[in-house]
């Protein structure tokens, strides 16, 4: 079910499937075999094999990294590395010589560095680097990092295995497979990727917390760890499991050099400055270049000498210690030496002689180490401790011996050394051979570089000894001698005498002679060291740790790809939601804009129609009134005529003498009165007409005003509806976005849990293999002890019997029969002692087995506890993030609602202003319409929303 959910989370829409892309720096139309010739295999990395290739035209050498890809998505995973290599042009960074994609394989051609990787050189020389060498490498690495960081690139996998050396004494930073190319210089990343031992604390925290991303300062921490690795061969906490070291990095103090007096104060100061757990106060690469430790470093002569020493011709000789020689040496030891040896102490030294000659090399003889005894367990423990700590006096430890090396013939000076660079140089995963032509036994698991040392001082191997053949010079009774011998052997047994004697027979002495040229002078260095069975175990542990790192890197790569896919899906979902929100918003706006346009168009048509109707109405009404007034005017004139007739008739009734004069007076008065009355009548008709027209105009204007107000109300209601819908959309969008982001956060943590469970399964698998390996080693060792015990007991019984008989011969007492009884009694005691010894060995083996089982169970419990803590921390962090997200959403909704109130008020105020403006507009028109001087002017009405009205 969980896997189905995981597939559902990473599933992208069908139309988002990418077509075949054409990459700028990758050629798809050329077979790389036609351009490059494969001349050898360099190694096998985590994602593919690395070959040594030669350009068929120019003859340039390259390291060809060949990676099989199943699909285009996997091909895209390597594009960042190719792009970084193609864009970077720096003296201390490897260059990209070409990239091809042919028949499902990606070929990345990288600049070839004959000196190999720094960690391979340290294994070759069996020592850490000297401070001048570290100083030179550090300065060049800082210059390369300063350039990378200026190009907005975070390397994210700095370690000695990714620092290559050239024959000119320069370094080349390599392996950008997990690097990040940012858009901004201060851009942060939250990917949990890199190699655990070199990870910065802020990168480790990203395994369970993505809200504390890191920046380019993570490379500075990795640089400091790399310097410690160069000084001590191994990085800090190398004895821990790769997954368990993460907890150590996060919780412990920054690591330091194990030896204080061996290194300069400037070196310690530099490491203290670089290994600052707070990335904010951690300096940049440019600032560290001003540190006194690297500021004084000039030139690259130390690295040239280092490469020359690593590429030297090597002669290995093996000297095996025989049993007879051991017994002879054992007889020569004094009882005093025997007594001292009860506290087991192992020191492995080397004899070194260096002689510079003008034209040739003189053979050197190594001083044979003194043959010693020690317990096998203590020896193994001491060897492991020696790998962890370098001596304070700068002398190299004798580590990483090779138990499967056979005696080699001397190399002639005219033979060209056969060297293979390392796959670690390009993937940081494998160490391959960097030695001269050398014969090894067929059982050798892999070629490991041989070692050399820089100091001409002699080293001697002093092993504390304890021998069983002590003898007795006292003339005591036979039974006393028997009891002393039994007690002595019992004490020897308790201190691991028997197993140690057998272990002593398997020790070998390796004498190695290196010949190389320094500044035109040939130098010969001869080293000698004792190797044992633990050498092979150390090599196996190193190989298994590389396997674990490789498995971890594969998991990180897959996790990074899944994270990128999920991030791409989330980005697409957010973008799709934003587009949908915008479309919905635009759709609603468009709908209401269309409604408003329709309403305004209808309003305009309605107003125009009303104005036309009003014009027709005014014209008809004016025509009707004028017709009535003309009729009234005619009636008024007829009345005046009638009155004139009546006046004439009345004057005709007067006497003739008065008639003419009276007629004239009466007619003049009547004419004047008629003119006055007629003028008044016409004026009254005009007033009536104007009044009627004014009433009609006011009625029309009122109708238009009502219609305009009706349309304005409808328009404002539409605007209110639009704003309400927009606000609802905004709130719904906030809710939907919150739900999407919340679901994406859950998907993100689901993916993290899934990847964390995969890591935990891999950790448990590795722990199971480790426990199984420890149990197998214990059973094998116990089986060997069980097989050796009868042989040792037989030899010891023979020796003790001989000693007992000698003691009887030295101090004879009693008759021959009594002596035979004593011998018989001694034999019975020997049988009892051997039986008790076998029983004690069985009990010891059972106890060891129980302890080993308890230790394995404890390891599993500790691992499960740590895994449970990580899971709990991840779940707790998810809960906190979800809670924080909900609180943020609630706060956002609260702020949005608080902002809605002033928006609503401003919107209503704007609508009210439009109403007031409309009322003001019609009020002014009414005042204009009521002006008596303008009453005769034709009136034209406009819509309030029309441009003429405004």
Curated annotation (Swiss-Prot):
Ranges of Basic and acidic residues composition bias in the record: 347-356, 416-432
Binding annotation for ATP: 42-50, 65
Catalysed reactions, semicolon-separated: L-seryl-[protein] + ATP = O-phospho-L-seryl-[protein] + ADP + H(+); L-threonyl-[protein] + ATP = O-phospho-L-threonyl-[protein] + ADP + H(+)
SUPFAM superfamilies cross-referenced by the UniProt entry: Protein kinase-like (PK-like) (SSF56112)
Modified residues (Phosphoserine): 482, 486, 490
Gene Ontology MF terms in the entry: ATP binding; protein homodimerization activity; protein serine kinase activity; protein serine/threonine kinase activity
Known EC number: 2.7.11.1
Gene3D superfamilies, per database record: Phosphorylase Kinase, domain 1, Transferase(Phosphotransferase) domain 1
UniProt keyword annotation of NAD present: no
Family per similarity comment: Belongs to the protein kinase superfamily. STE Ser/Thr protein kinase family. STE20 subfamily.
Function field: May act as a polo kinase kinase by mediating phosphorylation of plk1/plx1 and subsequent activation of plk1/plx1 during oocyte maturation.
Name under which the protein is recorded: Serine/threonine-protein kinase 10-A
């Amino acid at each position: 079910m969980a896997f189905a959910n995981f597939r559902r989370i990473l599933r992208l829409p069908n139309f988002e499937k990418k077509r075949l892309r054409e990459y700028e720096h990758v050629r798809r139309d050329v077979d790389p075999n036609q351009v490059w010739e494969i001349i050898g295999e360099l190694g096998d990395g985590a994602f593919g094999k690395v070959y040594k290739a030669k350009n068929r035209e120019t003859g340039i050498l390259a390291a060809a990294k060949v990676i099989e890809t199943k699909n285009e998505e996997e091909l895209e995973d390597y594009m960042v590395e190719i792009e970084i290599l193609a864009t970077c042009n720096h003296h201390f960074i490897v260059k990209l010589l070409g990239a091809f994609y042919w028949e499902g394989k990606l070929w990345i051609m990288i600049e070839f560095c004959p000196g190999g990787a720094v960690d391979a050189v340290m294994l070759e020389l069996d020592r850490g680097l000297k401070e001048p060498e570290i100083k030179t490498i550090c300065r060049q690495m800082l210059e390369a990092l300063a350039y990378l960081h200026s190009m907005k690139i975070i390397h994210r996998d700095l370690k000695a295995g990714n620092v290559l050396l050239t024959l000119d004494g320069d370094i080349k930073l390599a392996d950008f497979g997990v690097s990040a190319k940012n858009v901004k210089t201060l851009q942060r990343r939250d990917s949990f990727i890199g190699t655990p031992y070199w990870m910065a604390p802020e990168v480790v925290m990203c395994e369970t917390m993505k809200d504390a991303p890191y920046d380019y300062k993570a490379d500075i921490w990795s640089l400091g760890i790399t310097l410690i690795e160069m000084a001590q061969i191994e990085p800090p906490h190398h004895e821990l499991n790769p997954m368990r070291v993460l907890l150590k990095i996060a919780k412990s103090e920054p690591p330091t050099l194990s030896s204080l007096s061996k290194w300069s104060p400037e070196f310690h100061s530099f490491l203290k400055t670089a290994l600052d757990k707070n990335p904010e106060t951690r300096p940049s690469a440019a600032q560290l270049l001003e540190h006194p430790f690297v500021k004084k470093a000039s030139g690259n002569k130390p690295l040239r000498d280092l490469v020359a020493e690593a590429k030297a011709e090597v002669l290995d000789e093996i000297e095996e210690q025989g049993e007879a020689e051991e017994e002879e040496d054992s007889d020569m030891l004094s009882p005093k030496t025997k007594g001292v040896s009860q506290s087991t102490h192992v020191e492995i030294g080397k004899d070194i002689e260096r002689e510079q000659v003008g034209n040739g090399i003189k053979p050197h003889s190594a001083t044979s180490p003194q043959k010693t005894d020690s317990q096998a367990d203590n020896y193994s423990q001491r060897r492991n401790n020696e790998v962890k700590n370098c001596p304070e006096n700068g002398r190299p430890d004798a580590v990483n011996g090779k138990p499967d090396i056979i005696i080699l013939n001397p190399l002639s000076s005219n033979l060209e050394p056969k060297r293979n660079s390392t796959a670690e140089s390009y993937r940081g995963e494998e160490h391959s051979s960097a030695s001269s032509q050398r014969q090894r036994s067929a059982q050798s698991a892999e070629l490991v570089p041989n070692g050399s040392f820089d100091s001409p001082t002699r080293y001697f191997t002093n092993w504390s000894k304890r021998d069983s053949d002590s003898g007795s010079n006292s003339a005591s009774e036979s039974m006393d001698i028997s009891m002393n011998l039994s007690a002595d052997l019992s004490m020897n047994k308790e201190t691991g005498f028997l197993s140690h004697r057998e272990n002593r027979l398997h020790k070998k002495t390796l004498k190695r002679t290196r010949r190389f040229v320094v500044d035109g002078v040939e130098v010969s260095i001869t080293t000698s060291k004792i190797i044992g069975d633990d050498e092979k175990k150390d090599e196996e542990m190193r190989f298994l740790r590389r396997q674990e790192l490789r498995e971890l890197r594969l998991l990180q790569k897959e996790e990074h790809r899944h994270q990128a896919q999920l991030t791409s899906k989330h980005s697409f979902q957010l973008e799709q939601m934003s587009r949908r929100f915008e479309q919905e918003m635009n759709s609603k706006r468009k709908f209401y804009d269309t409604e408003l346009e329709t309403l305004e168009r209808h309003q305009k048509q309605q107003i125009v129609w009303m104005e036309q109707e009003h014009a027709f109405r005014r014209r008809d009404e004016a025509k009707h009134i004028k017709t009535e007034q003309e009729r009234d005017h005619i009636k008024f004139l007829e009345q005046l005529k009638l009155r004139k007739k009546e006046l004439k008739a009345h004057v005709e009734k007067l006497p003739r003498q008065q008639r003419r004069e009276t007629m004239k007076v009466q007619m003049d008065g009547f004419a004047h009165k008629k003119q006055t009355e007629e003028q008044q009548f016409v004026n009254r008709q005009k007033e009536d007409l104007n009044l009627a027209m004014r009433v009609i105009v006011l009625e029309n204007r009122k109708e238009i005003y009502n219609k305009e107000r009706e349309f304005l109300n409808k328009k404002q209601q539409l605007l209110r509806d639009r704003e309400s819908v927009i606000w609802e959309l905004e709130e719904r969008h906030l809710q939907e976005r919150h739900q999407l982001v919340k679901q994406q956060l859950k998907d993100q943590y689901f993916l993290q849990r899934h990847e964390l469970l995969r890591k935990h399964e891999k950790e448990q698998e590795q722990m199971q293999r480790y426990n199984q390996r420890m149990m197998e080693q214990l059973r094998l060792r116990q089986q060997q002890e069980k097989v050796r015990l009868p042989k040792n007991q037989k030899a010891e019984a023979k020796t003790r019997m001989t000693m007992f008989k000698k003691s009887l011969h030295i101090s004879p007492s009693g008759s021959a029969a009594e002596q035979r009884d004593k011998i018989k009694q001694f034999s019975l005691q020997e049988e009892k002692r051997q039986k008790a010894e076998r029983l004690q060995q069985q009990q010891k083996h059972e106890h060891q087995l129980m302890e080993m089982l308890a230790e394995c169970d404890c390891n599993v419990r500790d691992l499960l506890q740590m895994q449970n803590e990580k899971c709990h921390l991840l779940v707790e962090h998810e809960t906190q993030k979800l809670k924080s997200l909900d609180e943020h959403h609630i706060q956002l909704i609260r702020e949005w609602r608080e902002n809605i109130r002033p928006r609503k008020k401003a919107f209503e105020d704007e609508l009210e202003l439009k109403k007031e403006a409309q009322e003001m507009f019609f009020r002014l028109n009414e005042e204009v319409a009521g002006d008596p001087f303008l009453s005769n002017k034709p009136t034209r009405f406009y819509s309030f929303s029309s441009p003429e009205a405004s």
